[in-house]
Amino acid sequence: MINDDLIVLLEPIIKNMGYELWGCEYLSQGKHSLLRIYIDKPDGIGIDDCQEVSKQVSAMLDVEDPIPGHYSLEISSPGIPRPLFSIWQYQRYLGYEIHVKTFKPVNGKRKLSGIIVSASEDTIVLDINNEHQEILLSNIVKANLTV
């Protein structure tokens, strides 16, 4: 999980460039680690946008060095199966269907799909087959909009 301090470092730089910091993932796979930063803007993200943000963020990360060890930096658009990281993103997509993977089972399942009915500070409520299911945000490993 990405440290909030890293978000605090990244957000002003990305925002000042005219983009929205959509979210971050840090994937550690043995010797190869990856810091993936998702950016967005109303008219979409292109390769040039990713390159521009990569240069600025890379320079800041080299100076601040918030992540120990070696890793690759990737700047990306959230894409079509858009990942959801923050409560404001769940609120933005009320009424949309999402896929959710949880740490602990919810009603015996760790993979759920449903329509976002509500999103509060620490929980979301999904409509799954006309039944409301509350899921703690702290229990969500990954959530994506359904394509």
From Swiss-Prot:
Q: Which InterPro entries is this protein grouped with? A: Ribosome_maturation_RimP (IPR003728), RimP_C (IPR028998), RimP_C_sf (IPR036847), RimP_N (IPR028989), RimP_N_sf (IPR035956)
Keyword Disulfide bond on entry: no
A single Gene Ontology CC annotation of this entry is: cytosol
Q: What's the main place this protein lives?
A: cytoplasm
Keyword set for this entry? Cytoplasm, Ribosome biogenesis
Q: Where in the cell is it found?
A: Cytoplasm
Offer one example of a GO biological process linked to this entry.
translation
- Cited Gene3D superfamilies: Ribosome maturation factor RimP, C-terminal domain, RimP-like superfamily, N-terminal
Role, per record: Required for maturation of 30S ribosomal subunits.
- Give the matching NCBIfam families: PRK00092.1-1
Q: Which family does it belong to?
A: Belongs to the RimP family.
Instruction: Specify the protein name.
Output: Ribosome maturation factor RimP
Annotated organism of origin: Legionella pneumophila subsp. pneumophila (strain Philadelphia 1 / ATCC 33152 / DSM 7513)
Q: What is the lineage of its organism?
A: Bacteria, Pseudomonadati, Pseudomonadota, Gammaproteobacteria, Legionellales
